[in-house]
Amino acid sequence: MQYLISSLIFLIPSLGMVAGLSVAATVTIFLLMLFLRGINRHCERLKGAWQSHKAGLLRLLRQNLQFFLAMTIKTELLFTAWCFISCLFAIRPINSLATFIQVFILLFLGFTVSNCVPFGNRVQLKNSLILGILTAILLFFIEYSSHGFLTRTFKASFGLYMLDRGCALLSITSWVAIIILLSSGKRRHALMLYILVLYLLSISDSLASFLGFSIGGVIFILARLIKPIFFKLIAISLITGSLLFPVIAKQIEPRDLSEKYLATQPSAAHRLFIWHFVANKITLKPILGYGFASSKYIKVNNSEMINYNGEKWHPLPLHPHNNILQITLELGIIGLILFLCLVYKYLKQINNIKSSNFRAASYSCFINYYIIGMISYNIWQIWWISSGIWVLVLMKLLVKPDIVVDN
């Protein structure tokens, strides 16, 4: 079991670089292995055959469920309940309910695993993670310099954008490696890793990952320098900015802004049109929204299609490419308030960490993930949720046990 866990810790970031969607499968397998490990350890404490094992399994599940309810009744459970309720009035209730089940089973599994017994032989697992990250970096440069040598083995063509998911995964996973190096006294190596990943992201096609990782670096420094006021500063900034974003998106003139500042960035220009369109849709159902995971089912008339520089763009291709707008569009103001309550809660938990480096790296990773979600990806995409859970589990079971922290 230990060998398989070590192999997966190496494989997830490295394979994820060239096949980003694989994270959904590899992280799920990783979580299931840890979950089964927890069950086996619990059952080993019990004597007897099948009945004892059965009783142990049921007892473990009951304990995890009770702990889950006790810890989340004020925030997570309320948000989950509202997501479920919104499925009932969604544009396609069955599809929304199916997505809801997938998402929250994965989240529950991740929560359960993250509260299990820490990894054994953590030095080996830490080395596997760092080696996996370095392999991911190497694979990126191979693909970048050879115009997709590995990708073209399986696909007819290659575009640098095909590595965007891998870059996003690398950007958030690197913070785990950075805190591992810092906690081992290897500050120079941690700085070198940050600079290397930052350079990689700067030449990649993933602007969201580059912005998230670079701002994460600034956050790391600020969290170390102004610890007494940093929590209030970051909490007020994030929550206020998130509340104002739908208002700002409605007020902007995407065509004027695109022609002035984004003439050579069609992808960024398209996002401005998407955000403006979504903000206008939000005003039609501001309180309840359109229902969980309903973005891709909202009908668009031909008159609403965007004509820009001879190209015809869809104003809402699958999702809003912004987590705050997607939450508000699908779950309404009620969902947005509950979501921001979760954001505040997690920031508060990070602030309770006593280790300066661990606290700063946790802030950086959280902001990195948040910023990527504000520019790219569907908030309910399984591979993206899996990426966040993957980092959470590593932080709690691989990094935290070797650092004295609170919460």
Swiss-Prot record:
Top-level taxon of the source organism: Bacteria
GO cellular component, as recorded: membrane
Membrane topology: Multi-pass membrane protein
Keyword terms of this UniProt record: Membrane, Transmembrane, Transmembrane helix
Transmembrane segments: 15-35, 71-91, 100-120, 129-149, 166-186, 203-223, 229-249, 272-292, 324-344, 379-399
Subcellular location: Membrane
Keyword Methyltransferase applies: no
Pfam family, one: Wzy_C
Main location: membrane
Family: Belongs to the O-antigen ligase family.
Name of the protein described by the UniProt record: Putative polysaccharide ligase RF_0568
Origin species: Rickettsia felis (strain ATCC VR-1525 / URRWXCal2)
